From Swiss-Prot:
Classification via Pfam families: Peripla_BP_2
Listed HAMAP family: BtuF
Gene Ontology annotations of biological process type: cobalamin transport
Annotated GO CC locations: periplasmic space
Entry keyword annotation includes Transport: yes
Domain Fe/B12 periplasmic-binding residues, every copy: 30-277
Residues at which cyanocob(III)alamin binds: Y57
Cellular compartments annotated: Periplasm
Record-given protein name: Vitamin B12-binding protein
Lineage: Bacteria, Pseudomonadati, Pseudomonadota, Gammaproteobacteria, Enterobacterales
Annotated site residue numbers, Important for BtuC binding: E79, E209
């Protein structure tokens, strides 16, 4: 007979149990988000109704557009934040200036930092946000759905023939991604091999010659079809390979919607034939 403690629980029961264990004495009532990605995380975790202000470019979901802006690329409006009396601030460690955040923390305002460098950390952030959410079960369910979607993509494309992939950001100067970014993980998820995965810095500046030397089979950019045309023209005549453009917000924000970019990339990359043999 199986011991009671080892009896397998249905998935729904597990999610409910986790929700009860992480339910705080009092959920956050006045939340401020300082980046578009943390704004999306807040809504996914059931905190959308508690947001009182957000950062510039927080445009998803639609209701986020109606909220006051207290942060932008120019900085954080500490005075206005204090006037709004938040009991929780969601910050982007890699993008928000640290000094004003330290000032706010010194005044006793809880700050939740989000800066995932791995896809699985987005789900972890959702689970962690459950403790502040009036709907913790929503946060845990969003995290579980995210993990399931990631696993589905991994299973579907794990056996794909690897394609050497150049992640391109800009042209003059020309930047790319190392293997230690979310964007590179999305490429790997779809069977791509980031040709600059070995870079020691997350976002290295590279030369045209360095890219050519590594012989990419596909180029990935964020943008629209016009971006595809511009990038293709930029590499002519030396390099003629498929260029895939991904929705900029989906691809560049550390939120659940990054899996929409992953699905977009996986489908397009799978349709690109792999050369039978190449000369080296």
């Amino acid at each position: 007979m199986m011991p009671l403690g080892l009896f397998p629980l249905p998935r729904a029961a597990v999610v409910l149990l986790i929700s009860l264990l992480t339910l705080p004495a009092q959920a956050a009532e006045r939340v401020i988000s300082l980046s578009p990605s943390t704004t999306e995380l807040a809504y996914a975790a059931g905190l959308g109704d508690k947001l009182v202000a957000v950062s510039a470019y927080s445009d998803y979901p639609e209701s986020a557009k109606k909220l006051e802006h207290v942060a932008s690329w120019q900085g954080i409006n500490v005075e206005r934040i204090l006037a709004l009396k938040p009991d929780l601030i969601l910050a982007w460690r890699g993008g928000n200036p640290q000094r004003p955040l330290d000032q706010l923390a010194a005044l006793g305002i809880p700050i939740f930092y989000s800066d995932p460098t791995h896809i699985d950390q987005i789900a972890s952030d959702l689970d962690k946000l459950a403790q502040y959410s009036p709907h913790p079960e929503q946060a845990h369910q969003a995290a579980e759905q995210f993990r399931q979607h990631v696993n589905t993509l991994r299973d579907r494309y794990a056996r794909s023939q690897p394609k050497r992939t150049f992640l391109q950001f800009g042209t003059q100067p020309l930047f790319t991604s190392s293997g230690h970014t979310l964007q590179s993980e999305v490429v790997s998820l779809c069977g791509g091999e980031n040709i600059f995965a070995d870079s020691r810095v997350p976002w290295p500046q590279v030369s045209r010659e360095q890219v050519m030397t590594r012989k990419p089979q596909v180029i990935v950019v964020s943008g629209t079809q016009s971006q595809v045309d511009n990038v293709s023209a930029f590499w002519l005549p030396q390099l003629v390979v498929p260029v895939i453009a991904l929705n900029e917000d989906w691809f560049n924000r550390a939120s659940p919607r990054i899996l929409l970019a992953a699905q977009q990339l996986c489908q397009q990359m799978a349709s690109i034939p792999t050369p039978v043999a190449e000369s080296h």
